[in-house]
Amino acid sequence: MFDQLDIVEERYEQLNELLSDPDVVNDSDKLRKYSKEQADLQKTVDVYRNYKAKKEELADIEEMLSETDDKEEVEMLKEESNGIKAELPNLEEELKILLIPKDPNDDKDVIVEIRAAAGGDEAAIFAGDLMRMYSKYAESQGFKTEIVEASESDHGGYKEISFSVSGNGAYSKLKFENGAHRVQRVPETESGGRIHTSTATVAVLPEVEDVEIEIRNEDLKIDTYRSSGAGGQHVNTTDSAVRITHLPTGVIATSSEKSQIQNREKAMKVLKARLYDMKVQEEQQKYASQRKSAVGTGDRSERIRTYNYPQSRVTDHRIGLTLQKLGQIMEGHLEEIIDALTLSEQTDKLKELNNGEL
């Protein structure tokens, strides 16, 4: 571990020199690239330097202890020594976590897609509730949300809705939401007071750069049409909505806001994210066949969470976490769940590192 940390610290110093080089300062791409790399290493270097300083301080105390016979001084030095010895294991654990390979998508913006599944109108209403929950959470994190495409249900909510979430670390916070979400509650239209179970699926797709996935113009079919709202009524009087089909895969992306130019840009952004996600899902399925991660396979059909309204309970099935805070969670207070899932993922990766499997 410490050999790795020495390499990280050495690279950090190299980046310091590069960022003061006039050739780099005058090249915006290099400046941005090196600044980001240095920022990514900053926490690891800070903790490692603190760890080394504590080790040196401990060595100095041990040396002083060997040179003194003064009881009062010995007692004071031993107290300092014990305090540092208690700190070191925590710093070592923190360094192990900091050395875990970072998900390359963590800092990216995302496209979130929510689809009503089993449960008819109630599933569509629940899809709308999830959309509201994520929007409130995004707002609390300083992220920006923008609807890309929405198909409203006649009785409220959405048959399906996709929206972008922009902000540093958006994917790292929302990536664990992939999967099937189940709700148990009495629908407003249910006169007998019976509890119904409905589901909605959530897909979180990292937005991708052009360099990450190649799309040829000849592989695209672009159609324009009039967008419609709930009940089928036309929202726009011009053909501003855009549908883009990727012919080799059959993947389709649409956007139906007022501007055709903006719709084309949004639809292309979604198409790229879906094609990239398709590639990632194939790779994950190969990996999942060898080892199932602690936070699930990421399979879209995997039931990950249940929202039980009568008992005000939310259960995340991947890590066995149950919280009696349904009201707060539906208002966007997802921090406790996301932190627990992040910790579970880190623990899982740490086990693999210790077994030499990464």
Swiss-Prot record:
Record-linked InterPro entries: PCRF, Pep_chain_release_fac_I, Pep_chain_release_fac_I_sf, Prokaryotic/Mito_RF, RF-1
PROSITE patterns linked to this entry: RF_PROK_I
UniProt-annotated location(s): Cytoplasm
PTM sites of type N5-methylglutamine: 233
Modification(s) after translation: Methylated by PrmC. Methylation increases the termination efficiency of RF1.
Listed GO CC annotations: cytoplasm
Annotated keywords: Cytoplasm, Methylation, Protein biosynthesis
Pfam families linked: PCRF, RF-1
Molecular function via GO: translation release factor activity, codon specific
Signal peptide: none
Cell inner membrane in keyword set: no
Entry similarity comment: Belongs to the prokaryotic/mitochondrial release factor family.
NCBIfam families: prfA (TIGR00019), PRK00591.1 (NF001859)
Physiological role: Peptide chain release factor 1 directs the termination of translation in response to the peptide chain termination codons UAG and UAA.
The protein, known as: Peptide chain release factor 1
Organism listed in the record: Staphylococcus aureus (strain NCTC 8325 / PS 47)
Gene: prfA
